[in-house]
């Protein structure tokens, strides 16, 4: 029988000092011997997705203590990618994922916690906590802050739905008046919560449901809705049930590595492809798989992308639907139900929401779908749950409204979620391309690519940084038919693998959204759409071919054939490579780029791998 980890610091005379300190935190005599549950919160006033999380730890703690545990809360950092975007702050976003993972590991292991509840929400916080949870392999439940309501405003007497990307595009579009731009800006992000489309934060929170580590509704229930309160309380109850199963019954199926196994990672990627999730999810799933010792690679993603249809289309891929609409259609469980009926899902995997013979968290995804898939459930409470809707009232407060849609969206032919027969497309929303530009692959969010752009041939317009590319786009240097190449923005070369939302937004605002392509060894915001190809691996700083592209080179992109090719002979490429090597210490470095890189970022860059490995640390440099 596994012994409580916390016994290390609570049992025996030699731990009298530790017990004295525990007592100073509020632990009583009769508490010693109970499991200590760490609550990793991420409250901050910097981030709308986290501004409402201050009291969520106390809510979870109340359920833990009622179930017989000791709850101890701590906080991690949280970077807002939207606020950090477009300047040097974006260099810190992806590296913050590793810091979050490490900080959770440090706190949990330093204090010998027995189990963990992760309260996350935005772009790098959920992935960082996921990496830590799988690294630690102690009972865990995830519960996020939830998505914000979609913005709404009237323009030219027409009511339109908005999100963050609309504000960015309007701000850069000279055809939009100052008055309309300001109106869009003020309406785009009306409430607390993660940005309202299928951007990175919401994509990752949805994927925790598919991995089996969070409760139904986690990825789609609005941050403002009163029903979300129960998710926090149930997370506390569930983690205690998992802890008791593991420590009292020696049931290893309660551990995250046995829940989030290879099949669960396939389920998560299947969901991601079907819902056209952010391309960043590829990066984070690859990183999480390594922490779980699961052999899940780009090859698996490529294989699955050819099999899974696109069943759910959400902003930024369409202005019609946002996360509140996904929830109305049944949320993640609604999409998984359609995937199951299409024969594309493993339903024999464990799930924290599944009960078996009255034992919480001991059943499989099959039983979760039977209860929570709105197309098959007979539970009226579940249907009521998925009818939770927006109030349309600006607020930073959680659980501030209890509005309901008049009905569920069960239209699987023309609704937000489709059946396989009526899919938006029979190939999914993400694809892996490869070729001499990206020998180890690159990623495109096909859900956001217009059909006319599925194949594209153009001339390279090369930039050594995102800043230079933005200047080139806004300055009129980029013209129709160009393939904008932004390099040395990968994990090592940036460092930090910046998001390229501003270049893609500015291409749209200049009327070039369908007339140009963009490729980069950096990454894209979940808010990106258009022919935007990121994660080029190997990156330029690691000797990738993207570093050898020259202005005017012909680049051929063929998404149906999963191909990206630089139309330059091998002889010429070898000559360019030799020339690069001849530069010695200056080889594989950007030409003329002026950028301050702090010591902290240099430390990250020293160990960073390319995107095809999840941009995680190169373990070979750390092992003896």
From Swiss-Prot:
Keywords: 2Fe-2S, Amino-acid biosynthesis, Branched-chain amino acid biosynthesis, Iron, Iron-sulfur, Lyase, Magnesium, Metal-binding. It holds the Pfam family ILVD_EDD_N. PROSITE patterns: ILVD_EDD_1, ILVD_EDD_2. Mg(2+) binds at residues 81, 123-124, 499. The active site is at 525 (proton acceptor). Its cofactor is [2Fe-2S] cluster; Mg(2+). GO terms for biological process: isoleucine biosynthetic process; L-valine biosynthetic process. Binds 1 [2Fe-2S] cluster per subunit. This cluster acts as a Lewis acid cofactor. The modification N6-carboxylysine is found at residue 124. [2Fe-2S] cluster binds at residues 122, 195. Its EC number is 4.2.1.9. Pathway: Amino-acid biosynthesis; L-isoleucine biosynthesis; L-isoleucine from 2-oxobutanoate: step 3/4; Amino-acid biosynthesis; L-valine biosynthesis; L-valine from pyruvate: step 3/4. GO terms for molecular function: 2 iron, 2 sulfur cluster binding; dihydroxy-acid dehydratase activity; magnesium ion binding. It comes from the Bacteria. GO terms for cellular component: cytosol. InterPro entries: Dihydro-acid_dehy_C, DihydroxyA_deHydtase, DiOHA_6PGluconate_deHydtase_CS, ILV_EDD_C, ILV_EDD_N, IlvD/EDD_N. It catalyses: (2R)-2,3-dihydroxy-3-methylbutanoate = 3-methyl-2-oxobutanoate + H2O; (2R,3R)-2,3-dihydroxy-3-methylpentanoate = (S)-3-methyl-2-oxopentanoate + H2O. The keyword 4Fe-4S does not apply. HAMAP family: IlvD (MF_00012). Belongs to the IlvD/Edd family. Functions in the biosynthesis of branched-chain amino acids. Catalyzes the dehydration of (2R,3R)-2,3-dihydroxy-3-methylpentanoate (2,3-dihydroxy-3-methylvalerate) into 2-oxo-3-methylpentanoate (2-oxo-3-methylvalerate) and of (2R)-2,3-dihydroxy-3-methylbutanoate (2,3-dihydroxyisovalerate) into 2-oxo-3-methylbutanoate (2-oxoisovalerate), the penultimate precursor to L-isoleucine and L-valine, respectively. Homodimer. This is Dihydroxy-acid dehydratase. It comes from Shewanella baltica (strain OS185).
